[in-house]
């Protein structure tokens, strides 16, 4: 049963090119088990009964999106991406406002190249944060020993990992709160790496919700190969 979970909007920033993949197209359009990475990233949201709608931010000259079957899904709306991730997300939020979405609506921002989001993680995030005053994100506690390096690549110190988490997506915040944080950070020329960092800069503390470690982001070729080996596990 999902009736107790809050309704939400999804935002997918997908205007990047993923240069580290060294592929012939943006990494979100590479194939994975018969679908593109992007399609896998969208499906967990499109299959959720509490989804109010989804906004995807794409490069203005994106030649691949229109060929995907999901491009014709009436629940998906396209906007132009920005120069950086934060600009792409902000454009999507502005579009939601223009469509009449409320400042109090929940928005979940998810990486276009993170195709292995488990439905159980999505439901847990929604349930845990439904009444949270700030919002939060899926994350995983650091498992490996962490080293801080100098500019020459030599170890300076070993970092205490007991309080270190690896940030994942989705990241879930109120539309108005996230909009203001992103807009203000851009005006102030602050470097924003994800939505949670914008909320932190605005003086609030997002909540960490532990998720599955296999909700990985495809960044390098070996990430895609690992996912291809596990594609039979999709749809959990």
UniProtKB/Swiss-Prot annotation:
The record marks 161, 217 as: Positions MEP for the nucleophilic attack. GO terms for biological process: isopentenyl diphosphate biosynthetic process, methylerythritol 4-phosphate pathway. It catalyses: 2-C-methyl-D-erythritol 4-phosphate + CTP + H(+) = 4-CDP-2-C-methyl-D-erythritol + diphosphate. GO terms for molecular function: 2-C-methyl-D-erythritol 4-phosphate cytidylyltransferase activity. Pathway: Isoprenoid biosynthesis; isopentenyl diphosphate biosynthesis via DXP pathway; isopentenyl diphosphate from 1-deoxy-D-xylulose 5-phosphate: step 2/6. Pfam families: IspD (PF01128). Its EC number is 2.7.7.60. InterPro entries: IspD, IspD/TarI, IspD/TarI_cytidylyltransf_bact, ISPD_synthase_CS, Nucleotide-diphossugar_trans. Gene3D superfamilies: Spore Coat Polysaccharide Biosynthesis Protein SpsA, Chain A (3.90.550.10). Signal peptide: none annotated. It is an enzyme of class 2 (transferase). SUPFAM superfamilies: Nucleotide-diphospho-sugar transferases (SSF53448). Keywords: Isoprene biosynthesis, Nucleotidyltransferase, Transferase. The record marks 20, 27 as: Transition state stabilizer. It comes from the Bacteria. Catalyzes the formation of 4-diphosphocytidyl-2-C-methyl-D-erythritol from CTP and 2-C-methyl-D-erythritol 4-phosphate (MEP). Belongs to the IspD/TarI cytidylyltransferase family. IspD subfamily. This is 2-C-methyl-D-erythritol 4-phosphate cytidylyltransferase.
């Amino acid at each position: 049963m999902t009736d107790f979970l809050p309704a939400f909007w999804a935002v997918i920033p997908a205007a990047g090119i993923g240069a580290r993949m060294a592929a012939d197209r943006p990494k979100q359009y590479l194939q994975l088990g018969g679908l593109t990475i992007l399609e896998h990233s969208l499906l967990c949201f499109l299959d959720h009964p509490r989804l109010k709608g989804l906004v995807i931010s794409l490069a203005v000259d994106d030649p691949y999106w229109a060929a995907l079957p999901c491009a014709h899904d009436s629940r998906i709306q396209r906007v132009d991406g920005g120069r950086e991730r934060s600009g792409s997300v902000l454009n999507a939020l502005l579009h939601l406002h223009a469509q009449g979405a409320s400042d109090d609506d929940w928005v979940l921002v998810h990486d276009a190249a993170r195709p292995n989001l488990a439905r159980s993680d999505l439901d847990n995030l929604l349930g845990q944060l439904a009444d949270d005053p700030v919002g939060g994100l899926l994350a995983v506690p650091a498992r490996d020993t962490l080293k801080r390096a100098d500019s020459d690549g030599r170890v300076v110190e070993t970092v205490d990992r007991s309080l270190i988490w690896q940030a994942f997506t989705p990241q879930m915040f109120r539309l108005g709160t996230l909009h203001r944080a992103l807009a203000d950070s851009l005006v102030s020329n602050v470097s924003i790496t994800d939505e949670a960092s914008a909320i932190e800069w605005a003086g609030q503390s997002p909540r960490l919700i532990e998720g599955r470690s296999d909700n990985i982001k495809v960044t390098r070729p070996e990430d895609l190969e690992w996912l291809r080996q596990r594609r039979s596990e999709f749809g959990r």
